[in-house]
Amino acid sequence: MRVTTGRCPQNASSRPLKVALVGECMIEMRGDPASGFSQTFGGDTLNTAVYLSRLSPASHIVTDYITAVGTDSFSDAMRQLWRDEGVGDGHVRIIDGAQPGLYFIQTDAQGERRFLYWRGEAAARQTFDGPQADALLQALADYDYLYLSGISLAILTATGRECLLQALRRARASGTRIVFDNNYRPHLWPDAEAARQAYGDLLRLTDLALITWEDDALLFGYADAEALFEAYGAFGVSEVALKRGEAACLIQCTDGRFEVPAEQVRHIVDTTAAGDSFSAAYLACRLQGGDPSLAARWGHRLAAQVVQHRGALIPRTAMPSLALPSFSSAVEA
């Protein structure tokens, strides 16, 4: 992503930027047998899509979600939630007889989470499988930005993943920018080498990488941030935001390398979607003309608010106030 002074690109082209996030939304259950359970929906890229939509005026940025769902009532409720949040579902694939995946979240006294998943037969695994996916794959090139995570890659069949990567290559060749959040979950991959191969294929197409240090260390094992930045530079990634939890975020971009301190939170309730919300705020700021330093501050501010609430999606009334300075630079699309 290149930063220039001047007006935002959507103003110059008289249309909003089109952004699509690719991944999986699941049925979320929270609680325990003793106290009971509550049900909602979640998923890393879906969480990011919702927060991106909340932070982006519809006149500037159109946010869509790309996945596959079934014909059951939970799938219908998911799509209604997305629409209510301003997230478009026009490119959601509907598969007869399929259904969403499901997961349980349990949190300890420090707000750290334990997940139990049932997703092996989820509709999202088939998003890019078969000839029925051809139109969806072609539509990826219609977007200005495509956002994916490591989970977006992991949940797909091997055939679907390769079809997606081929479509991403075509889209990027036609001018689409790629944003990648590494979110590495070892249990979703047959082995680490398969994950490294898929990540490498996508990183070679990536313009902006939003990286969680712990996940990256687990997969690639870089000794320090310097080694990570060098490796991502070799992949051709022009902007990297390295998320390190409560520590400062480290940025590598065309302006050099620098750090942006995190906001301190006295009482953490639930860390679910902390990284997803950071990524959403960072991207929202960049797409509206903010520089990487301001984008990281937006990310820290939203993440700090999210971890003080239970669940991935906080109430709209709890969203922090985030604003761009009038002299902000613009992201060149």
Label each residue range with its predicted role:
Residues 1-87, 333:
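Glycine-rich phosphate/adenosyl-contacting loop at the front of the ribokinase-like
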Residues 2-17, 221-333:
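Conserved phosphate-binding/catalytic region of the ribokinase-like
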Residues 18-20, 144-145, 208:
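Structural motif
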Residues 25, 182, 277:
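Active-site metal-binding loops of divalent metal-dependent hydrolases
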Residues 60-151, 323-333:
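Conserved N-terminal subdomain of the carbohydrate kinase-like
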Residues 74-87, 171-172, 195-206, 228-229, ...:
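Short, electropositive alpha-helical surface patch
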Residues 124-125, 153-162, 186-193, 219:
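Active-site glycine- and acidic-residue-rich loops that bind
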Residues 174, 184-257:
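Conserved phosphate/ATP/ADP-binding segment of small-molecule kinases
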